[in-house]
Design a protein with these regions (language model features):
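Positively charged, low-complexity terminal tracts
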Residues: 1-78
């Protein structure tokens, strides 16, 4: 583990910055915090990953439950 207390294991999705002045872009990553089991993580990152915004880390089951609820609320399909 590195001195940053996290390790990005896999980058799944990177969304573009909303406008030219944004410092951070949102990413969905598989990440390990403090050597603990991998979680799905959504947060903003600087281009070089030296800085991050507050975000949320979820287990697979938590992620599925939240995605399902969001799709149902918006009228989407699973």
């Amino acid at each position: 583990m590195n001195d940053k207390n996290y390790e990005i294991k896999e980058k799944i999705l990177s969304l573009p910055k909303e406008n030219e002045t944004d410092v951070y872009h949102k990413e969905l990553n598989v990440i390990s915090w403090y050597g603990k089991p991998d979680k799905l993580d959504i947060r903003g990152w600087s281009d070089d990953h030296s800085k991050m915004t507050k975000g949320i880390s979820l287990s697979k089951d938590e992620f599925i439950e939240i995605a399902r609820a969001g799709l149902e609320k918006l009228g989407g399909k699973e």
